[in-house]
From Swiss-Prot:
Protein name: Small ribosomal subunit protein uS11c
Upper classification of the organism: Eukaryota, Viridiplantae, Streptophyta, Embryophyta, Tracheophyta
InterPro entries (UniProt xref): Ribosomal_uS11 (IPR001971), Ribosomal_uS11_bac-type (IPR019981), Ribosomal_uS11_CS (IPR018102), Ribosomal_uS11_sf (IPR036967)
GO-annotated cellular components: chloroplast; ribonucleoprotein complex; ribosome
GO MF, any single term: structural constituent of ribosome
HAMAP family: Ribosomal_uS11 (MF_01310)
Superkingdom as given in the UniProt entry: Eukaryota
Cellular localisation: Plastid, Chloroplast
Source organism per UniProt: Acorus calamus (Sweet flag)
Length: 138
């Protein structure tokens, strides 16, 4: 006999979703991708499955304000708030990109109360691979 899945929403408004069960995650990995235009924070478990994510754009910042340190701090706080409620205590931080939100996101992660095992910079650096695009003339 199959187990019934609880549904939320109604058929009339067309929004039917499956309710997620909150699992306990004691340890995870926090990925911070900081570009000049936006900052994306993704929290995964140790196996790499996404638990929570947030970006400066989803936090309500639009246009050039998405690249600011304050927007990165807000995005990191939003992504981590949900996993702290699920019981995450330890995490590893992987920071990628040259953006302004790198330090602000890391500061928000440290303030959240999660113990950090290590902070690693995983920005991809070419060993003189592809030719870069030509410089902009403004």
């Amino acid at each position: 006999m199959t187990k019934t899945i609880p549904r939320i929403g109604s058929r009339r408004n067309g929004r039917i979703g499956l309710r997620k069960t909150g699992r306990r995650i004691p340890k995870g990995i926090i990925h911070v991708q900081a570009s000049f235009n936006n900052t994306i924070v993704t929290v995964t478990d140790v196996r790499g499955r996404v638990v929570s994510w947030s970006s400066a754009g989803t936090c309500g910042f639009k246009g050039t304000r998405r690249g600011t340190p304050f927007a990165a701090q807000t995005a990191a706080g939003n992504a981590i708030r949900t996993v702290v409620d699920q019981g995450m205590q330890r995490a590893e931080v992987m920071i990628k990109g040259p953006g302004l939100g790198r330090d602000a996101a890391l500061r928000a992660i440290r303030r959240s109360g999660i113990l950090l095992n290590f902070v690693r910079d995983v920005t991809p650096m070419p060993h003189n691979g592809c030719r870069p695009p030509k410089k902009r003339r403004v």
